[in-house]
Amino acid sequence: MSELLSDKDIKSERGELNDWSYDGVKISKEIRFKTYMDSIDMINLIAEEAERINHHPDLKVGYCNIVVDFTSHDLGGVTKGCIQMAKYIDTETK
């Protein structure tokens, strides 16, 4: 099981992320798309990677956007798995 990252570690890692916010418990990002189906395609990519590494986000789907939240529900904070998934999403949305 992953360990919680310290606020200092999260701040350092966020420097490598693109537009992710941190509220003390989770990291979040809103991603906009040209079409609804583009957002659904991204949801599917995120779901496949989340299953592969066994670290699942909370996802909110809008018309042409999604909001992604990462936290460890078991530990109550941000872990390396959260950061790993955020980096994956940043790579897929360049």
Question: What does each model-found stretch correspond to?
Answer:
Residues 68-92:
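C-terminal structural segments of small proteins and small subunits
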